[in-house]
A protein has these predicted regions:
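Active-site loop/helix belt of alpha/beta enzymes
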Residues: 1-89, 153, 158-159
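Charged (often Lys/Glu-rich) extended helix/loop segments that serve as interaction or gating elements
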Residues: 51, 62-169
Length: 169
């Protein structure tokens, strides 16, 4: 539904511009077709494009050239970042500690300069241990070694890892 709402606004703008004598020959509907990060079920490209084209035709704009940019839907789930666990920093439970002091940190050799989306957009990325361990999983914030408070890859992730292990993001 958000795509259709955005399309309606775009078509209103096109109509306003053309009412002033400026012809519009094509519509670029942008990109960002959804991909699955956790349990989301984005609409298929066929369903989304079908709904958009139906709305474009219904609003009398079917004669225009329509462009789409598939964005991350083409490659978003195609890559994996592998990183080594450099250090495990257990949290403390002392009264009066600053915020976050009770957290456990898994410090890895990948950083926000390797994968910017979590730091910049709070994007959720799956993180799994590459070694199978019988250890009880611990909840960690997975962070990089850059001296910057925003250098994190995942918050509150349950992992059974040790120093020297590898994770896949």
């Amino acid at each position: 539904r958000p795509y259709l709402d955005a399309l309606d606004r775009m078509l209103e703008l096109v109509e306003a511009v053309e009412a002033r004598g400026i012809p519009i020959h094509h519509l670029d509907l942008g990109g960002g077709l959804g991909i699955t990060y956790t349990d989301e079920v984005p609409p298929s490209a066929e369903a989304l494009v079908g709904a958009l084209l139906a709305r474009i035709d219904a609003r009398g704009h079917g004669h225009r050239k329509i462009m789409f940019e598939p964005g991350r839907s083409l490659v978003g789930n195609a890559g994996v970042l592998v990183s080594e666990v450099l250090y495990i920093k257990p949290g403390t439970e002392q009264h009066g500690d600053p915020a976050g002091a009770g957290k456990n940190f898994c410090i890895v050799d990948a950083a926000m300069n390797d994968l910017m989306r979590p730091a910049m957009y709070q994007a959720w990325m799956g993180i799994v241990a590459c070694q199978l361990r019988s250890d009880t999983p611990v909840v960690f914030d997975v962070v990089g070694p850059v001296c910057e408070s925003g250098d994190w890859l995942g918050r509150e992730r349950s992992l059974a890892v040790r120093e020297g292990d590898f994770i896949a993001v």
